[in-house]
Amino acid sequence: VLFRSWLTQVPEDFRFVVKLYGGFTGQAKWQDSYPSMTAMQEHFLETLQPMIESGKLFCFLAQFPAQFKCTKENVAYLETLRELFNDLPVAIELRDYSWYGKEFIEKTRQLMRTLNFSLVMVDEPQLPDTVPLDTTVTNPNFSLFRFHGRNQAYWNDRTGDWRKKRTLYRYNEAELKILGE
């Protein structure tokens, strides 16, 4: 496995953030590759066991798509996800505003605390279809901050090599100072 060699090539105190396979977050159909969700989980964790055992895993990142709205079904799915990953560190990136609206933000934070997830702190352009920067710590053991940049010009542009342009952004000193506080 490719990543096994990484474990010996990084400094002793280096830790990896591993993005979950899209089957866990609805960005791929796990049914196309696995007979059950449990089989998917077992294969995923078995593959990453050397990283987990070495202590090089910082956390798993579950980046949910914007279609993952704040619904009872999706809350139940997050509970299932916690069961699948037991006590392993998992950071949850929610990309739909419904989780952050006035009606649900406190419930979202409490859900993350209850399930022992870290709600990812995301800095991205502030547009009608993006999520606000929420720096609330929901897991006292670890937090994850993702700097997507503030490139408003290309954020919603889905033409050409849009993925490369979308996050093409260099923070200035003033922005970094504010984010560092």
Predicted regions located by residue number:
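Residues lining hydrophobic/aromatic ligand-binding pockets adjacent to catalytic sites
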Residues: 1-181
